[in-house]
Swiss-Prot record:
Nucleotide-binding protein. Belongs to the YajQ family. Gene3D superfamilies: 3.30.70.860, YajQ-like, domain 2. SUPFAM superfamilies: YajQ-like. The keyword NAD does not apply. Keywords: Nucleotide-binding. One of its GO terms (molecular function) is nucleotide binding. The lineage of its organism: Bacteria, Pseudomonadati, Pseudomonadota, Betaproteobacteria, Burkholderiales. This is Nucleotide-binding protein Pnuc_0290. GO terms for cellular component: cytosol.
């Protein structure tokens, strides 16, 4: 029986490439000369450093731009906290969203059931498994979810025939 999983995970390789490109652009830009502005990745979070609020905003804009060019959805990042570290220097932490929250998974299951497509959806941890009789039904379900769910970037993997 054909099936696939609905997940919410960024491509970590592309995210790392976007971070490296951001740091390279920041080091080469004239308006960042002599500043300690950079982007670091620690486990499941990104840490942005800037000399002041304006430069921190510029670092964030550069990162978002590079993520968009590498097809990494910005909705994977959730602003956590901004703090002052010594003098005027600022640090912002952004959490990387991995996995579907329970409320989002319930919404996905409800959308699938309300659509009357002949598929079954079951919540399995931080993913939703969708199984159906025909491949076309699964593809129709994918299109429906892409259209209906806008608050989180959904991905589809483990497509089995």
């Amino acid at each position: 029986m054909p099936s696939f999983d609905v997940v919410c995970e960024p491509d970590m390789v592309e995210l790392k490439n976007a971070i490296e490109q951001s740091n390279k652009e920041i080091s080469n830009r004239f308006d960042f000369k002599g500043s300690d502005s950079r982007v670091e990745q620690k486990d499941e979070a990104l840490i942005l450093f800037g000399d002041d609020d304006f430069k921190l905003g510029q670092v964030r804009d550069v990162l978002v731009n590079k993520m968009a060019k590498r097809n990494v959805d910005v909705r994977y990042l959730k602003d956590d906290k901004t703090e002052t570290i010594g003098g005027d220097k600022r640090k912002q932490t952004m959490k990387i969203q991995k996995g579907i929250t329970s409320e989002l998974s319930k919404k996905v299951v409800r959308i699938i059931k309300d659509s009357k497509i002949k598929v079954q959806a079951s919540i399995q941890g931080d993913a939703v498994r969708v199984t159906g009789g025909k491949r076309d039904d699964l593809q129709e379900t994918m299109a429906l979810l892409k259209k209906e769910v806008t608050e989180a970037p959904l991905g589809f993997n483990n497509f089995r025939d």
